[in-house]
């Protein structure tokens, strides 16, 4: 049964520049501990993503009135899992004093995060290929952030390509240094959650000091988007800007 929660319009404005598949060290994945995948598909165009989605049998191409749509099944999660969202509480850090800790912003210690991070990295080091999207959140140059997503599924790259601002050309990717990276190991189930004192086998965990987050155990694409939006809601007020719950990836 096809899930109703992700319908990525292929009739969107196409990003026609082709970016070639590259190695881990070329874009700095090795600094995250990801060394194994021999092929990194970097900022693929929509037609290229569709070819990968179909080759990987990740969903179904549907003919719709307003253009072709690729429909996928996200499993048991058709929405976010807010009770599984965690933030590293680093004593005496900047984030420790700025975050409103409670039932929404729930703390975990750095050791638990490192365990979750290791599970994600170990998974990607077992793959032959993966997908990387580099882009921007926020249209204003004054508040715009560089974001990177590392995925095992082409459709999740498709999703973030729709949600975030794509680079206009290769020059914007030259020496790209993300302000934050999300590593989405959606197929990895955290079987140690009870021992760690977490809510379930799903984990969406952020380390603001290390500028990285990991997603485990949920295929729901919205966790990618909401993760960065949550970070913007943290960063922007500290920069003197009121944050709003809205976005656009195409002007006009």
Language model features with spans:
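N-terminal mitochondrial targeting presequence
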Residues: 1-25
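A noncatalytic interaction/capping subdomain that flanks phosphate/NTP-handling catalytic cores
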Residues: 21-251
